């Protein structure tokens, strides 16, 4: 008999505890083992009840969500799914993802939500996925805020735009993207486009804070934006990104919502426009999206890289691409910045 997933619900609102508990336990594979009304009580119950997953509100008395996450990751690591109405607060959203929560879902409509049942299946699915993550790979990102003088020196190296770094990731992606761009030089002759699993409601606040803590200039992908060297464009997985050459012979982004395989669409369009000047990168995630797009990159003589499976929070996305034989290099997360830089440098020397 398969054991049920044990969940602890942490929220200061009695209504939300009841609603979340009822919708999760409507699935026969999930059992609510307890609840807590603030972070301090939640920590005590994590240690006593040993849940497989916790759902966590961010706005609570005694100990707020961010402080609670910090303590959880040090004292009693467990997968955390945030369910909060504070998605518009850039600092809180960013900090929660930086500290290593596996998912961040906005409450459907405010702190006391009467339509939370509309989100029932999504929350059930995310809790089930959280229960099988590799806990060893859940860790906080250590970042330093860049001052304006440092950013000017780093961001504006007057490089040409010769390459595209196209990055695809689903669940677990925001944390991994932060680590990558905190170490990757913005002086590479490239632009970067990232499609990742993050709620469109959260994305603007996340991008704003992301830009403050990495040397790259970071923007939300917008339709018609002309690609610039040293800029990272981030899009939600709910959008699709393609590339187009405009009347001024500039490469611009097209943002739409028509494809059910956003990563395949991203990689295929990148290959068609940039050809051998594209590096495709698959990071942590679930599903098989990206595999067909990687095949197109290889066909156009670009390079495909996958994060090493053992360093992924969710390895399934990468395993599918490796099994299909469309990955040129498998690289540990720590080695990704150096590998990407070396590939661009070696390609530039070959073409001189």
Please give the residue ranges for each predicted region:
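Conserved acid/base catalytic micro-environments in cytosolic active-site loops
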Residues: 2-8, 14-25, 29, 40-41, ...
């Amino acid at each position: 008999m398969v054991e049920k997933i044990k969940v602890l619900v942490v929220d200061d609102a009695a209504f939300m505890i009841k609603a979340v508990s009822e919708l999760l336990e409507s699935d026969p594979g999930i059992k609510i083992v307890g609840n807590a009304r603030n972070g301090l009580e939640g920590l005590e119950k994590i240690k006593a009840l040993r849940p497989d997953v916790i759902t966590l509100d961010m706005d609570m008395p005694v100990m707020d969500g961010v402080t609670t996450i910090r303590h959880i990751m040090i004292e009693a690591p467990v997968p955390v799914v945030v369910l909060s109405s504070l998605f518009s607060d850039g600092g809180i959203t960013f900090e929660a993802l930086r500290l290593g929560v596996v998912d961040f879902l906005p409450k459907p409509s405010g702190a006391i939500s009467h339509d939370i049942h509309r989100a029932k299946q999504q929350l059930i699915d995310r809790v089930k996925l959280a229960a099988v993550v590799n806990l060893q790979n859940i860790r906080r990102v250590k970042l330093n805020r860049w001052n304006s003088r440092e950013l000017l020196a780093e961001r504006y190296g007057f490089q040409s735009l010769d390459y595209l770094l196209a990055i695809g990731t689903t669940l677990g992606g925001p944390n991994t993207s932060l680590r990558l761009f905190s170490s990757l030089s913005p002086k590479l002759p490239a632009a970067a486009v990232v499609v990742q699993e993050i709620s469109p409601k959260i994305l603007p606040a996340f991008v704003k804070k992301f830009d403050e803590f990495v040397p790259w200039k970071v923007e939300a992908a917008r339709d018609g934006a002309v690609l610039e060297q040293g800029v990272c464009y981030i899009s939600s997985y709910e959008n699709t990104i393609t590339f187009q050459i405009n009347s001024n012979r500039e490469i611009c982004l097209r943002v739409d919502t028509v494809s059910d395989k956003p990563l395949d669409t991203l990689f295929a369009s990148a290959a068609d426009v940039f050809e051998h000047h594209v590096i495709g990168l698959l990071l942590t995630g679930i599903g098989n999206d990206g595999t067909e797009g990687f095949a197109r990159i290889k066909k156009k003589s670009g390079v495909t890289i996958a994060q090493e499976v053992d360093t992924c929070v969710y390895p399934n996305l990468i395993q599918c691409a490796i099994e299909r034989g469309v990955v040129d290099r498998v690289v540990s997360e720590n080695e990704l910045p150096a590998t990407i830089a070396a590939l661009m440098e070696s390609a530039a020397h070959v073409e001189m």
